[in-house]
Amino acid sequence: MTITAVMRSLAAAALLLVACGLAGAQETKPELSRVRLAVGGKPALFYLPLTVTERLGYFRDAGLEVEISDFPGGARALQALIGGSADVVTGAYDHTIQMQAKNQPIVAVVQLGEFPGYVLAVLAGKAQGYRSPADLKGMKIGVTAPGSSTQFMAQHLMVKHGLKRDDASFVGIGASASAVAAVQRGEIDAIVNVDPVINLLQSQGLIKVVADTRTLAGTRDVFGGAYPAAVLYAPRAFIEEKPRTTQALVNALVRALKWIADRSAQEVAAVMPPDYALGNPALYQQSIKTSLPMYSRDGRFSREAAETAYAVLKAFDPDVAGAKVDVAATYTNAFVEKAAAQP
């Protein structure tokens, strides 16, 4: 046998060993049986795939006990991760870019939403004098939590229309009944939130929508392109040290995305907690119907959409603007690709 033939045989054997190793790893249980997951505003339709995964028992089927802690907004969920009280987060993709800019590598492993569904609205009493985001100057704007992606949307539009990002004040109002109450009591001048909150406030005539990312066209109008929304992210160290646990989480979420894609709004609403409807089941079901197109069908990330998010953040966030961010390192499709092979 020639040296070349020997080398080829060794290479083939090595590939076989790798393949066997990967197959064995896939058959091995996750490194962790219990995972602590943080989320900011779980009743929001932004996070519907997470709740579907939980309610249908897909985490359990993947060999995981997932303990979900719900915080008032995404920034609080991120703080839980950084502080060590959470292992992973279901949150906005934006945070992966911001944390990399701070030399804290956070990586998104599955995309749940292909556009955000955020809506900027002014209260009815302010609607007559509103012409553009430049009129947000001096307003008190209710967001899910200070530092959350709902605040980023408002600041992006403000900077885009000649304002500074601190030309308005921001107050956290959550993403459920507390947000509705803040508007009803007139505690704020404008709001950035998601359905079902926005849909309910619209039905009551309390707000005027002025920017809407509940559709792809609206997202392009606001952000200039497709924009990643809800994702599952974790520290790079967790992903590298717990690859089977990460894969199990992704498998469960991708399974839920496939389930959602094949169901009607009525079927999806039936598995959600009744209190998420904010007292109006019919309107809630309609909100789900409107939101269904924004959920990913396969969990994959688009480089183009990720670059759009980076461009938006760089325009108003000095930390991002002053850092060298490798956008390709903020997400991975590796786990989603393996999940796609599931039956």
Predicted feature locations:
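Conserved C-terminal helix/tail region of periplasmic/extracytoplasmic solute-binding proteins
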Residues: 310-343
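Short, low-complexity disordered leader/linker segments with a strong preference
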Residues: 1-32, 341-343
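Pocket-lining segment of extracytoplasmic ligand-binding domains
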Residues: 178-274
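Short, glycine-/small- and polar/acidic-enriched structural segments
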Residues: 26-174, 185-195, 206, 210-211
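Extracytoplasmic/secreted envelope proteins and their assembly/folding machinery
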Residues: 47, 78, 93-96, 133, ...
